[in-house]
Amino acid sequence: GNKVTTIQGEGDERTVSTVEKNALPGGKWEMIESLRGIDEETPSSCTRTVKKYTEGGWLTISRTEGYKTSLAQTTLYTYNDQFRVSLEIKPDGGYTRYEYDDQGRTVLSAAPWAGGGEKGTRTTYADLRFNDFRPATETEVIIAENGEETALLKRTYTYEDSPQASRTTVTETALGSDQVHTSVEEAYGEAAEYAYARGRQKMSQGIDGVQTVYTYEAATEYGALHKVTATVQAHGTIVPAQSTRSVHYLAENGATTRKEQYVHTGKDWSL
């Protein structure tokens, strides 16, 4: 095995981190990482990770937090023939199990439920483009011990992409309810005139109909490159005394150099 020790910081604040690697029988390795203060005997944290070499590369089969203490917590991992985690066993004995499609996308994640059986999420995918990991539907389900499933909640995602904007609409319906909650997210497309805006948030609308609309333009003051304006409105209209507008001036590194907050008076925007 080998052991590497690194010391960071200054004076009494220094910390010592140690990484130790050892070969174990059966093509496995363990890595023990610990961290302690320079004057301390006992590590403040110690983690042991065990990996096994397989056709799918190195796979983590267990991870222990608080290693070599009475509070040690170990998580175990089992893999399927795609070398993806099929079962994660938690330190408290609970678990999460995963099922995948042939593209390796999660189609089910489920864990024990207080009411007996399991509670989980089933996911289908949009498949509108190559390797599309965007969900088409997410259904929250209860899986009884006999395998029978009950849907509690279903979210449906629709995607509209144009050079101007990409729009994602999410509709949510709960079991036994005829209420449909809809939320919308939009991002600027490749055709956005101001290059900085491309791919950035254009509009977000909550299930209450309140929208925030974002615009981006070049800034010439406050040492900023970009000016981002976010306007809050309801159902597409400005509401006096309720609609707000915030302006952020952003430097080249993304830091905000100035922020302004306005409210609409009924005639115009006032600080």
Which functions belong to the PLM regions below?
Residues 1-90, 94-271:
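Beta-strand elements of repeat-based all-beta scaffolds
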